[in-house]
Swiss-Prot record:
Electroneutral Na(+) /H(+) antiporter that extrudes Na(+) in exchange for external protons driven by the inward sodium ion chemical gradient, protecting cells from acidification that occurs from metabolism. Exchanges intracellular H(+) ions for extracellular Na(+) in 1:1 stoichiometry. Plays a key role in maintening intracellular pH neutral and cell volume, and thus is important for cell growth, proliferation, migration and survival. In addition, can transport lithium Li(+) and also functions as a Na(+)/Li(+) antiporter. Belongs to the monovalent cation:proton antiporter 1 (CPA1) transporter (TC 2.A.36) family. Residues 540-545 are annotated as: Confers pH-dependent PI(4,5)P2 binding. The chain crosses the membrane at residues 99-121, 131-148, 159-176, 187-215, 223-249, 253-283, 288-322, 329-341, 351-371, 374-404, 411-438, 445-469, 476-505. Residues 515-545 are annotated as: Interaction with CHP2. This is Sodium/hydrogen exchanger 1. Changing residue 181 to C: Reduces activity. The gene is SLC9A1. Predicted models used for more than 20 years predicted 10-12 transmembrane segments. More recently, the structure of SLC9A1 has been solved and reveals that SLC9A1 possesses 13 transmembrane regions. It comes from Homo sapiens (Human). Residues 782-791 have a biased composition (Polar residues).
């Protein structure tokens, strides 16, 4: 009841974050009495400089202290006769110095995690204010509290930031980088990252040098190289800040990859410019050779970092081939090789960020094909957790370091820096987008340009680079650091808090949270192959052509070396299908929909009953050459012959439409069949004279109807109405009987004469030639009997039109 009603009328949702903050601050009490994260001397130094201390219970791994007569414990319960006094056995001891550093680090991480939980418990705050802003505020409060009790707050050391906090964030971004969107927009990203960063650095440095000349006595002594160095530090977009803000607003994939890709790839430009101007500041005179070497160092730093990352990525992929028997250590290789790539690049002053991105992109497809799904899940969640904790610590220590650092405020310099940063960003984006849209198919709209310009956030990288400046060579480094912190706070707080309402106000397209299906993958690969073929036909080799070449090389050579077993020969579509099936199975398990699947106990029992045997590969029987040739011959003779296909496109060898050609062939076959059927019918009927068309027959009958009028009654042909065109429906028996009945009513002599004629059969007479200009007309002979005349008339005129007195015309079957 107390939990439901709350305490003093307050809901538990409001009490819980407050309790988290109180617990975190109470846990930081030992830190308030210490010197923050400043590493203390080693244990051996502490023990040698301090007086001998009491050995605690937990101190079991260190060597025992030297025992001296003065340090031996005294036992007051023993008499002085023959025995020395000693102290009582210590039951409990406190030794904070021994666990100081790991204890404080754990407390800071615990504070960061509790703050993240507290922010997401209160949805009203997290929906308005970005998480990075809240973490900076927490850092400011903790730093002010530490300073308020008279202690020195911990400061974010540059080595700690670059060697321990930044690599997890970059590795997480590089390993799970959306490679398709990144490669399709690589040209645009490189222009923004290289040309845009150079423009911001030189534009801001030149204008700040002009401000220093007219700004007053405090900033008159800042030279051109110092301002250019300051411009190179403050001009780069920070990937940590961009990730923290853009992940919350769920912007569409195009804008996200453009801004985030720029923040990743501008590291090479920032590193080169920083070291270049730092070295030039110590020179009395800078020549053309120095400028050329500085320009050359950009390619060395960028390409060298990529090369280092590729080498370590290939080594990691090759190592994962042999981890099938030791699945536990599979995720460790990914972390170690990636971190070694970063450290190796930093060792030679190359771009460590480029090395991390290259190693993650190269190793991922081959490592995922070799490792188990559990290892893949471990890598995914560990990287997400590690990067999230590092990002939280960076923003907290950014606030703490703001309180702890020494600052030098100058209104003219700070306000001019903030104003010129915004102007340089807007002008750079507008100018570069105008040039880029000339070559892009999908143009960047004014809304997209506004989001790209507004999303240029600065963060802890600029702060750490500013902190690295040596005060001996750069006396105004405190002023630089103050201006950098001001720009960071403005971009994170003002731009970070207002970018979400602006995205909603401008109705910018957001990211669609849809699951990728196998149908989408099939259509994507189909379109890729189609565009590759179109590029080959047109003779224009774009990125689809080179992507297809790279995929063929990867499938033919690289996969065989870096992927173990039969997975190297598995098509990409089948691999994607297996991946989708595994993902759906995991989602089914997590959702609790496993009612119909056997439990773990039944599965284990079935495995015990039926022991697992090694999978045996199906071996097809080998065919002899004679048998194979016989099969080919049978197929060639019985299968339909396929049409010949042209191997290449040529305007002189265009083929007809296959559908039109097939239709024409079908019409020709039908016409030939009709002609053959007509020939067969004509052969069977054997007409006595030339056949007339129905039109000529009607005209002839109409001109002389008496010549064709029957002089006696004709026999009636009975036709089955169910099948009027069937010759089987004619009743020849009834027809003969009807003829005999009709003959009884006439003269017996005539009937006998007709019977004799009928017995004589039908005589085929040759037709006399008619005179020119007259038609061939059938004229019955006077000596012919009526039945003979009827049969001859039917044979000579098989037309469809009936004679007078007849019923429906008779059509033979098939006509």
């Amino acid at each position: 009841m107390v939990l439901r009603s709350g305490i003093c009328g307050l809901s538990p949702h409001r009490i819980f974050p407050s309790l988290l903050v109180v617990v975190a601050l109470v846990g930081l009490l030992p830190v308030l009495r210490s010197h923050g994260l400043q590493l203390s001397p080693t244990a051996s130094t502490i023990r040698s400089s301090e007086p001998p201390r009491e050995r605690s219970i937990g101190d079991v791994t260190t060597a025992p202290p030297e025992v001296t007569p003065e340090s031996r414990p005294v036992n007051h319960s023993v008499t002085d006769h023959g025995m020395k006094p000693r102290k009582a056995f210590p039951v409990l001891g406190i030794d904070y110095t021994h666990v100081r550093t790991p204890f404080e680090i754990s407390l800071w991480i615990l504070l960061a995690c509790l703050m993240k939980i507290g922010f997401h418990v209160i949805p009203t705050i997290s929906s308005i204010v970005p998480e990075s802003c809240l973490l900076i505020v927490v850092g400011l409060l903790v730093g002010g509290l530490i300073k308020g009790v008279g202690e020195t707050p911990p400061f974010l050391q540059s080595d700690v930031f670059f060697l321990f906090l930044l690599p997890p964030i970059i590795l997480d971004a590089g390993y799970f980088l959306p490679l398709r969107q990144f490669t399709e927009n690589l040209g645009t990203i490189l222009i923004f990252a290289v040309v845009g960063t150079l423009w911001n650095a030189f534009f801001l440095g030149g204008l700040m040098y002009a401000v220093c000349l007219v700004g007053g006595e405090q900033i008159n002594n800042i030279g051109l190289l110092d301002n250019l160095l300051f411009g190179s530090i403050i001009s780069a977009v920070d990937p940590v800040a961009v990730l923290a803000v853009f992940e919350e607003i769920h912007i569409n994939e195009l804008l996200h990859i453009l801004v985030f890709g720029e923040s990743l790839l501008n590291d090479a430009v920032t590193v080169v410019l920083y070291h270049l101007f730092e070295e030039f500041a110590n020179y009395e005179h800078v020549g053309i050779v120095d400028i050329f070497l500085g320009f050359l160092s950009f390619f060395v730093v960028a390409l060298g970092g990529v090369l280092v990352g590729v080498v370590y990525g290939v080594i990691a992929a090759f190592t994962s081939r042999f981890t099938s028997h030791i699945r536990v250590i599979e995720p460790l290789f990914v972390f170690l090789y990636s971190y070694m790539a970063y450290l190796s690049a930093e060792l030679f002053h190359l771009s460590g960020i480029m090395a991390l991105i290259a190693s993650g992109v190269v190793m991922r497809p081959y490592v995922e094909a070799n490792i188990s799904h559990k290892s893949h899940t471990t890598i995914k969640y560990f990287l997400k957790m590690w990067s999230s904790v590092s990002e939280t610590l960076i923003f907290i220590f950014l606030g703490v370091s703001t309180v702890a650092g020494s600052h030098h405020w100058n209104w003219t310099f700070v306000i001019s820096t903030l104003l010129f940063c915004l102007i340089a960003r807007v002008l750079g984006v507008l100018g570069l987008t105008w040039f880029i849209n000339k070559f892009r198919i999908v143009k960047l709209t004014p809304k997209d340009q506004f989001i790209i310009a507004y999303g240029g956030l600065r963060g802890a990288i600029a702060f750490s680079l500013g902190y690295l400046l040596d005060k001996k060579h750069f006396p105004m480094c405190d002023l630089f650091l103050t201006a950098i912190i001001t720009v960071i706070f403005f971009t994170v707080f003002v731009q970070g808090m207002t970018i979400r309402p602006l995205v909603d106000l401008l109705a910018v397209k957001k990211k669609q949270e849809t699951k990728r299906s196998i149908n989408e993958e099939i259509h994507t690969q189909f379109l890729d192959h189609l565009l590759t073929g179109i590029e080959d036909i047109c003779g224009h080799y774009g990125h689809h052509h080179w992507k297809d070449k790279l995929n063929r090389f990867n499938k033919k050579y690289v996969k065989k070396c870096l992927i173990a077993g039969e997975r190297s020969k598995e098509p990409q579509l089948i691999a994607f299908y297996h991946k989708m099936e595994m993902k759906q199975a995991i989602e089914l398990v997590e959702s609790g929909g496993m009612g119909k699947i056997p439990s773990a106990v039944s599965t284990v029992s079935m495995q015990n009953i039926h022991p697992k045997s090694l999978p045996s590969e199906r071996i097809l029987p080998a065919l002899s050459k004679d048998k194979e040739e016989e099969i080919r011959k049978i197929l060639r003779n019985n299968l339909q012959k396929t049409r010949q296909r042209l191997r290449s496109y040529n305007r002189h060898t265009l083929v007809a439409d296959p559908y039109e050609e097939a239709w024409n062939q079908m019409l020709l076959r039908r016409q030939k069949a009709r002609q053959l059927e007509q020939k067969i019918n004509n052969y069977l009927t054997v007409p006595a004279h030339k056949l007339d068309s129905p039109t000529m027959s009607r005209a002839r009958i109409g001109s002389d109807p008496l010549a064709y009028e029957p002089k006696e009654d004709l026999p009636v042909i009975t036709i089955d109405p169910a099948s009027p065109q069937s010759p089987e429906s004619v009743d020849l028996v009834n027809e003969e009987l009807k003829g005999k009945v009709l003959g009884l009513s006439r003269d017996p002599a005539k009937v006998a004469e007709e019977d004799e004629d009928d017995d004589g059969g039908i005589m085929m007479r040759s037709k006399e030639t008619s005179s020119p200009g007259t038609d061939d007309v059938f004229t019955p002979a006077p000596s012919d009997s009526p039945s003979s005349q009827r049969i001859q008339r039917c044979l000579s005129d098989p037309g469809p039109h009936p004679e007078p007195g007849e019923g429906e015309p008779f059509f033979p079957k098939g006509q």
